[in-house]
Design a protein with these regions (language model features):
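Short alpha-helical "patches" and their helix-cap loops
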Residues: 182-197, 362-376
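Intrinsic, low-complexity terminal and presequence regions
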Residues: 322-341, 347, 351-401
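Surface-exposed loop/turn and secondary-structure junction residues enriched for glycine/proline
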Residues: 105-107, 112, 144-148, 152-155, ...
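Sequence-pattern detector for short linear motifs
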Residues: 77-79, 172, 360, 397
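Conserved phosphate/anionic-ligand binding catalytic regions in large, soluble enzymes, centered on
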Residues: 95, 159-175, 344-361
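Conserved catalytic cores of very large enzyme subunits
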Residues: 1-161, 182, 188-341, 345-348
Length: 401
């Protein structure tokens, strides 16, 4: 079954497009079989060609595959929270999810704050509003469920007791330059340390909400597919001197606590920074290894996937090559807006957030981000790499309520 599934995914559709869905997640555990089996060859061929699968890292984690459900391209739920709430569960993983997501606009908070203390006061106010709005939504949908408006959900799900209320963030990178006590982006250690303080603070506050409302809350690196552009555009109109990504052009905010998209071509330099940030989220977060084109060999894809899992603690990652599709010639490696064989215009595919879409269809902000993006050079990925030493700021277990 696995072989047939992967072969279908590798083949793509009739025009050579990769399938955007489903997005399979493969668990990389300490006993993962890295031998040159037929299924491994197919898995990493699919990874090298289309970047389809996600990889969940359990090698440097205290979690087991049964502790997590990956709901989509971004949402990962820690089922240990359900055990703490209910005293145990059987099969609850298929009955969980998120009732809603609220994304906090960090650059605006930093821009308006007088100092770091004022930043946290303003952040708390926004988080309080987010938590209360999620509680109102939960109460509303539960009422509608009980009144019979969602009969199929009622039949198969039963209720929303095992669903999380999710709070996320956008623009940690731009919050640094807008903060008058920092004036530096996430490429600087001072802002990285500030980001750690912010994420820890948000986790602690979510724990308070769990006790206050009696519901499950989690912290997510929200994809912000349209939010990253929409918030930046509105902020720029209201506060002309606020700093966004790509000053002087189409404004956007960098997703969650990611580095500037044009910062480096060294994937390990980016991983070293992201490793201490992404482990602080209690819900979805992902590191996309953006590649200019498909890797030349499935073994190179396997080596890179293995190296990341064995040297880093970040929980979720992808290899994301850019590819193009010609209506006549089919799949083309890399970014080729015109087919080199027949001269027709093509569709160029890359991950907009968690899934692949033609870049010609992206919103203005994401299109600008794509133009600014540096792809990673991974030619030396097969050689051993020493990751940054473990730091005290790293945490992998979520805060419970």
């Amino acid at each position: 079954v696995n072989k047939a599934f992967i072969e279908t995914m590798i083949e793509g559709d009739a025009n050579g497009r990769g399938f955007q869905y489903p997005i399979p997640t493969y668990s990389i555990t300490k006993d993962f079989d890295w031998s040159e089996t037929e299924n491994n060859r197919l898995l990493f061929e699919m990874t090298a060609k289309y970047g389809t699968p996600y990889f969940s890292n359990y090698i440097n984690s205290d979690m087991e595959p049964g502790d997590v459900r990956s709901m989509c391209c971004r949402l990962r739920l820690d089922l240990r929270e359900l055990r703490k709430k209910s005293g145990g569960f059987f099969g609850s993983g298929e009955s969980t999810g998120s009732v809603g997501v609220v994304t906090i606009n960090l650059p605006r908070i930093a821009y308006l704050a007088k100092d770091e203390a004022d930043f946290f006061v303003r952040l708390d106010r926004m988080m309080d509003l987010a938590a209360r709005s999620l509680k109102i939504k939960r109460t509303t949908v539960e009422k509608l469920l009980e009144e019979g408006l969602y009969p199929y959900t009622k039949r198969y799900l039963g209720g929303f007791d095992n669903h999380f209320s999710t709070i996320g963030l956008v623009g940690m990178n731009e919050a640094g330059p807008n903060a008058n006590w920092l004036r530096k982006d996430l490429t600087h250690e001072e802002t990285q340390n500030f980001a750690v303080r912010v994420l820890k603070h948000m986790r602690e506050r979510l724990s308070d909400y769990q006790e206050l409302y009696g519901d499950l809350y989690n912290l997510e690196a929200t994809p912000a597919e349209s939010t990253a552009y929409r918030l930046a555009k509105h902020d720029k109109a209201r506060y002309p001197d606020i700093i966004t990504a790509h000053e002087g052009g189409t404004p956007y905010y960098t997703n969650s606590s990611h580095l500037p998209v044009g910062y480096t071509e060294d994937v390990f330099a980016a991983l070293d920074v992201q490793d201490k940030l992404q482990t602080l989220y209690t819900s979805g977060t992902v590191f996309h290894t953006f590649l200019g084109e498909k890797l030349p060999d499935w073994r190179a894809a396997a080596a890179l996937v293995r190296k990341i899992a064995e040297n880093y603690e970040l929980p979720y990652y992808t290899l994301s090559p850019t590819y193009s599709v010609c209506a006549d010639q089919g799949y083309l490696a890399g970014e080729q807006f015109t087919c080199p064989i027949c001269g027709r215009k093509t569709e160029v595919y890359s991950r907009i957030t968690g899934y692949y879409r033609p870049v010609q269809n992206w919103n203005d902000g994401k299109s600008q981000e794509y133009q600014d993006r540096k792809t990673y050079q991974v030619s030396g990925a097969a050689q051993p790499h020493a990751a940054a030493p473990a730091e005290e700021v790293r945490e992998t277990a979520p805060v419970s309520g």
